[in-house]
Structures are given as structure tokens and as C-alpha cells.
Amino acid sequence: MDLGLKGKVAVVTGGSKGIGYATAEAFLKEGASVAICSRKKEELEEAKGALEKFGPIYAEVVDVSKGEENYHFAEQVFQHFGRLDIWVNNVGTTGYKKGEEYDEEEINLMVDTCFKSVVYGCQAAFRYMKKSGGAIVNVSSLAARCSSAGRSTLYGPLKSAINNLTNTFAGEYCAHNVRVCCIMPGFTATPLAKAAIPEEELKKNAMGTLLRRMAEPEEIAKPIVFLASDAASYMTATTIEVSGGRSMTLNPSFAYERLKENLE
């Protein structure tokens, strides 16, 4: 299937590793030009070097929790490529704590990184899409639907806010032919997850899916690219869960074992 991405320009925030890197690579392989950003210069340069073999890539150090840096990044991308068609808001952080353990600085960090960055990214993208149309994809989380109580108390509520924000911006931008969609990944084998969540808990969560494993970043990237493409031209204010069936049954492990018994 031709996704209609050849010649288009896609921005992927947090594109130096994990889901962001996989998404940037997927866009490039579909013929798009890609701009990535990260706060960490060394990681960004390494990612840019690895991605160059797939197609045109632009990289810039950006703190997406700051509005002006988003706006400047969008301007630089537009000047570099001459257009801006797609924006993927991918940056996030977890904060592995109970609610009572967060101090004011940590709360602000969570809000700035997980929520404000998405607001600013949508604003920055819209400045360049309102005349020619485009697509925005926000990366939320399964935690938006399932409580993360006792593990990362603020993460789920902030991701829920992204889901609502997606629908709100979809309504505000629709007259300009700008679509806004959202993806809710389940547990994914990213550097962020591995650093924030103990290995034993990661294993338990993987076994709690119908597919009995964590997702690979590439398995999240493909739906993101689809939502941003012309193949999804009638989709907006849409949130897609990609979780290996984690939220579809009360006891995924039990369902898996019973089905396995029947097959045997």
C-alpha cells in the first residue's frame, strides 16, 4: 500500500531513541523527509548519523517543554525543507513514584514534559499547516485508560489529558484540513521503560498482554505513520490503542492459557 508520504516532511519529537527513532526511520523508508529533536546533543547526533542512510534527515537540540523552542524548531524545519506536513508529539517521561512522593519541582517536570510539550507542538505545527493542511499524531499511553496507581501516579492522568487534547485540537483545526489523532502504546521495550520500571515488573506486564510480550518500538511506529499518512485521510479525533490486547480482558494471562489448552 502506498501511504502517500513521498515528498512530505515529518517532525518527530524525541526522535533520538525508542518509539521516536523507530517512527523517524519508518517515515524515511516511506519516502518522507524527517526532522527530529532531542535535548541530548550526543544522542541526537548519533541518531541522525544512523538515519541518514534512509533519507533526508534534519536534527536540532530542542527542549519541547518550552513553547518558544517548539516554535523556533518548526520555523527551522520549514526553512530547511520548504514545507511541514506532519508533526508527531512523542516526548514524555514517567516519574516512577507514588502521588504523595512528588515534590513541586517533579510535578512541574511531569506536566511540562508530558503535557505542555504536546500543546506547544500542536501550536507550532498548526502555524505551518493552517494554509496547506497536515496531520498531527500525539503519543499517549495505555496508562491514559488504566490507572498507574502506586507506580507513576501522575503519568496516566497526564496521558489522559493528551487524549482529550487530541479531540479538542481536532475540532479546532478541522476547518484548515489539519487532522489530529492519537496513539496509545502499551508496554514497549524502549530505553525509557527499561530505565524507569524494574525488570521483574516489565516481565509481569508483558505476561499480562494477550500476546505475552512487550511491543517493539517499530510496532508502535507503524500505526503512527499510518495515522499521519493519506491512507488515514478520513481519520481525525481518533485514538488507537496498540497494547497487545492488554486492556481488552480482565485477565489476559488466563485467556491465553485457556485458548492454548483448547488448541492442544
Walk through the language-model features, giving the residues of each.
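Conserved glycine-rich cofactor-binding loop
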Residues: V9, S16-G18
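The beta1-alpha1 cofactor-binding region of Rossmann-like NAD(H)/NADP(H)-dependent oxidoreductases
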Residues: V61-F73, E104, E218-E219
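Substrate-binding pocket helix/loop in short-chain dehydrogenase/reductase
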Residues: K98-V111, N205
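Active-site helix of classical SDR
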Residues: C122, L158, T166
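Alpha-helical segment proximal to the catalytic Tyr-Lys
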Residues: R127, G171-A175, S233
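Residue(s) in the substrate-gating loop at a strand-loop-helix junction
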Residues: S141
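Short C-terminal tail/terminal secondary-structure segment
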Residues: T236-E264
